[in-house]
Amino acid sequence: MTLWINGDWITGQGERRRKTNPVSAEILWQGNDANAAQVAEACQAARAAFPRWTREPFAARQAIVEKFAALLEAHKAELTEVIARETGKPRWEAETEVTAMINKIAISIKAYHARTGEQKSELVDGAATLRHRPHGVLAVFGPYNFPGHLPNGHIVPALLAGNTLIFKPSELTPWTGETVIKLWERAGLPAGVLNLVQGGRETGQALSSLDDLDGLLFTGSASTGYQLHRQLSGQPEKILALEMGGNNPLIIEDVANIDAAVHLTLQSAFITAGQRCTCARRLLVKQGAQGDAFLARLVDVAGRLQPGRWDDDPQPFIGGLISAQAAQHVMEAWRQREALGGRTLLAPRKVKEGTSLLTPGIIELTGVADVPDEEVFGPLLNVWRYAHFDEAIRLANNTRFGLSCGLVSTDRAQFEQLLLEARAGIVNWNKPLTGAASTAPFGGVGASGNHRPSAWYAADYCAWPMASLESPELTLPATLSPGLDFSRREAV
């Protein structure tokens, strides 16, 4: 029984699904997808639970969310292992994901009050009050790269705001989704407030096409995000928050500390085996001897990175990709760029055929035409050389995406120029592209999102504002508008 609908664990009636470890092929989870009828049942349960949940005092909703945080802390080791085994990422990184989930609770509570709490301004004849109301029933689509943390970033603020939810994890990480939902169950969520439906494309389409949804919160690829945007077009009454991918540039100017620049680049491009939406995909390096030295050192150090199993000791910097198919896709993208005329600086290599272990690849594409503007979700870094900083910014903006952008430079004026001219939601200076502050919004423009950033701003798309002018007494104004006559006429 792998679906949780209206407080009950039930068996899916759709396609049979099996999840294996992407490196060892060990079977981790088996179950059946939710069919369309079960997806509709989950929506009905959420709709029925909404009136009571939204009328609960905020303190009551907060107490359940904080109980969930305590359960995450108590089961940190267990959830860490589930995430690591299911995604293939090393244990150390999976542990940081669970820590981020725990920290998200307090941050979301603060963000609720700061962004969508109640504010009152006293007027001479009453008060002006701003309140926020939940949308109702929301669908949450989770990704596979951070199967605990990223859905958590939608679920927690949505529940705090008073919404009820249907959660569909990625079909590649059903075990993590189920494990997290069991902690919510233990936290005491009332039946129907949060429902779990497992499945792939058919389940997702059944969920997103429900007429009774009030909105959809999505983290994933641009292609799926665009499909959802088209599907919900003509329905302005539904909130749609899309957090999609990026083809992110990292600009390397002349720097004295080459090793520090190489370290920042490795953290930007290859952490999580390149499976972060903010990962650097395009490396823009200034022409000249210093740029040459930087690239040589980058190839040297990156060439020593050896992906390993989630539980290897000592721990590797990177583990496997989410699947052997994902690793193959990266290899095909590299070969495609070679065929276009790219010059391989570091060839990616499958560590073991049939597994998702893949070493990093680096390819130079300066002057190469028709390079696809796409997000290759894995450890493949494309390099361009530039002559001057204006050209670097032009190259950086030469993408339909707009998630993250970074600069490695000691020149503050260059960063100020980048802030003015970069088209990206995240612009970092001498910091990895993959670093983000939880007290700031997280999201992008263009093909990276629809102007609904998450993290600190997630509260914004989980509730709508309600403005009120109010007074406890009804009085006739001392001064009336022109043309109004309230004089008493004597009866004839």
Swiss-Prot record:
Q: Which GO terms describe its molecular function?
A: succinylglutamate-semialdehyde dehydrogenase activity
Question: Where, by residue number, is the active site?
Answer: E243, C277
User: Quick one: which pathway?
Assistant: Amino-acid degradation; L-arginine degradation via AST pathway; L-glutamate and succinate from L-arginine: step 4/5
Quote the InterPro entries the UniProt record gives. Ald_DH/histidinol_DH, Ald_DH_C, Ald_DH_CS_CYS, Ald_DH_CS_GLU, Ald_DH_N, Aldehyde_DH_dom, SuccinylGlu_semiald_DH_AstD
- What's a single GO BP term from this record? arginine catabolic process to succinate
Keywords of the record: Arginine metabolism, NAD, Oxidoreductase
* Catalyzed reactions: N-succinyl-L-glutamate 5-semialdehyde + NAD(+) + H2O = N-succinyl-L-glutamate + NADH + 2 H(+)
Report the function annotation for this chain: Catalyzes the NAD-dependent reduction of succinylglutamate semialdehyde into succinylglutamate.
Q: Which family does it belong to?
A: Belongs to the aldehyde dehydrogenase family. AstD subfamily.
Q: What is this protein called?
A: N-succinylglutamate 5-semialdehyde dehydrogenase
* This protein's encoding gene: astD
